[in-house]
Amino acid sequence: MSETPVTVPFVSFRPMERELDADLRGAFARVLDNSWYIGGREDAAFEKAFADYCGVRHCVGCGNGLDALVLILKAMGIGPGDEVIAPSNTFIATVLAISYAGATPVLVEPTLESYNIDPARIEAAVTPRTKAIMAVHLYGQCAPMDEINAIAHAHGLKVIEDAAQAHGATYKGRRAGSLGDAPGFSFYPGKNLGALGDAGCVTTNDDALAERIRALGNYGSDYKYHHVYKGQNSRLDELQAAFLAAKLPHLDAMNAERRRIAARYLAEMHNPAVTLPAELPDCTHVWHIFAVRCADRNALEKHLNARGIGTNKHYPTPIHLQGAYAELGLGRGALPLAEEISATELSLPMFYGMTDAQVQAVIDAVNEFEG
């Protein structure tokens, strides 16, 4: 009798949900019992816990990761007429935040080794209108922050971390969320630390900036019915804060499990047609995404899917070729590295609770591909 083939979804929340079921249900019951749903004790408790985790003084909750970046830019006074340098290889929310603030994104190419922005290319992109560098920690690995901060310091620029994919990642022993002037996090459910809905936050050591961000996310109000800014409604609700607080103590263990899976992939995948990602020496990668590259990416995807292996692409169309950013005037060939990554990248299954059999199935399927 033949064995049943092992299927592997691209992602599954079920193992984590089963393990934390009592904690999550307890968090829900606690919020319901308190009968306070916005700006209460759960929000305050999570903000303190996450600030402590990141090693900073302040955490300000908000509605989602995009809002976190928009609030940072607005609180810094960055807007129309200003430029913000950002990587060409990133999720569109990074650049949308710059647009929503009224500033102009200036896209800089990554390195193929890290997928993150190449600091050697940043200097040439700085102009008199540049006000900040948006450093994205893509796929779970920190950008080269020493070089980025040095360039920013030399030109009087702010450094904003887009840490949406890097909860718990470290750079030279310091956690993402403590490496720039103001980092923004997303707690979208699929993140390494995910809510059970949309949520986000900003972390910072800048007292005045934290105060402005909190006000801007609460209709521009510093206290009830007193509005000092033209703000917006972007707050972390009590229920999501309680869920996040229940999951935070498990984040390091869950990241360690991702690192164990990644270590197996890196050690046991030996297909010359598939380029594996790298963990850089100064970084602790938390493997939000395990991104490989293949010249015939679509054939690899078809091969894996036919064997019950789920995949995804991060991201199939680079920002400068999206219709939303036709205004940048950057046609095909303008940013060749971003275009190469978009054409060749494929994301393999990576989630807490993958069984050894599932990990082995992914490894075997990749090794069997004839590219």
Describe every region a protein language model picked out.
Residues E3-V6, P15-Y37:
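Glycine-rich phosphate-binding segment of PLP-dependent enzymes
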Residues K74-A163, T170:
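PLP-dependent aminotransferase-like
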Residues L96-I98, I151, R175, N192, ...:
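Hydrophobic/aromatic ligand-binding patch that stacks against planar heteroaromatic rings
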Residues V60, I85, V106, V159-I160, ...:
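Structural detector of well-ordered beta-strand residues that form the stable sheet scaffold
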Residues S35-E83, L96-A101, L107-E109, R174:
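Phosphate-binding glycine-rich loop
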Residues S2-E3, R14, G26, R41-K48, ...:
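PLP-dependent aminotransferase class I/II
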Residues F185-S186, G200-N205, A245:
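Short beta-strand-to-turn element immediately C-terminal to the catalytic PLP-Schiff-base lysine
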Residues E161-L196, K224-V228:
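Conserved active-site segment immediately N-terminal to the catalytic lysine
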